[in-house]
């Protein structure tokens, strides 16, 4: 029996879709997408070390997460399903497709799943902070009230002018503990371990090269702090690593709003309809 906490959106008899969230995210990241795909059964687990799965031991990388998801799909008896992964979830989705091709019919990678450019001169122990910066620092902070944590996100550069009810619910779900010692659910240990798999590990490069199913990638042109360039500023110029991968830029979004707002989620939904 799977140990992961799982949220499902949509009808139980809908066409199944496995949705894999990012490195400090949770199953609540898919609320906007679910509205755009009302006929689909969106299966959205909290990965170990995040959300309501935070008490599980941290993963040992993307392939560990993939094994968790394979166990979940086997338990649900879904057969092969399309898988959408956002940010780190894209890496997990690639690992799942490589390990269990019988469970994955197609991939959609949302600003993730392609190796990140390794910062020059950065040691393995510092990789998480080099990529996530203030995001990683957020995990060690405490918040006196739920409203204080909402205010953190309201002021975040990524959400300027984009705050909505989904984001409020997303922020609320992310908190654990009791006031005045509320903290984000994602554990620092989980982030540190998983960050090592984001820079072109041998297994990841082999998994991409071996993909035989559709694997489009949607790129956000702006990053975690709404800065130009995003996580993949030079992606169009980088060599293709997967024979079935196409790259499409999604206009006017950043790494968060490509999924967590209605305009971005609508484009993600359109891409899912193509591969389902």
Where are these regions (language model features)?
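A catalytic-pocket lid/entrance helix-loop region that shapes and gates access to the active site
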Residues: 110-144
């Amino acid at each position: 029996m799977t140990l992961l906490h799982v949220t499902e959106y949509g009808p139980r008899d809908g066409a199944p879709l496995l949705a894999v969230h990012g490195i400090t995210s949770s199953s609540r990241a898919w609320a906007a997408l679910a509205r755009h795909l009302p006929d689909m059964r969106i299966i959205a687990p909290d990965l170990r070390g995040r959300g309501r799965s935070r008490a599980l031991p941290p993963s040992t990388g993307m392939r560990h997460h993939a094994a968790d998801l394979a166990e979940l799909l086997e338990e649900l008896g879904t057969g092969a399903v399309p898988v959408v992964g956002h940010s780190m979830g894209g890496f997990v989705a690639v690992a799942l497709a490589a390990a269990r091709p019988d469970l994955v019919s197609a991939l959609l990678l949302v600003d993730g799943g392609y190796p990140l450019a390794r910062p020059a001169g950065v040691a393995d122990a510092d990789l998480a902070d080099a990529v996530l910066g203030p995001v990683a620092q957020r995990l060690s902070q405490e918040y006196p009230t739920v409203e204080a944590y909402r205010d953190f996100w309201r002021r975040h550069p990524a959400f300027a002018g984009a705050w909505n009810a989904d984001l409020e619910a997303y922020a609320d779900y992310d908190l654990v503990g009791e006031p005045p010692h509320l903290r984000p659910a994602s554990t620092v240990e989980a982030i540190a371990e998983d960050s090592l798999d984001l820079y072109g590990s041998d297994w990841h490069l082999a998994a991409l090269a071996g993909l035989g199913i559709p694997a489009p990638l949607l790129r956000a042109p702006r990053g975690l702090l709404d800065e130009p360039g995003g996580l993949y500023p030079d992606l169009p110029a980088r060599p293709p690593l997967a024979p079935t991968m196409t790259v499409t830029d999604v206009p006017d979004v950043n790494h968060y709003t490509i999924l967590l707002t209605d305009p971005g989620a609508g484009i993600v939904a359109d891409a899912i309809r193509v591969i389902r």
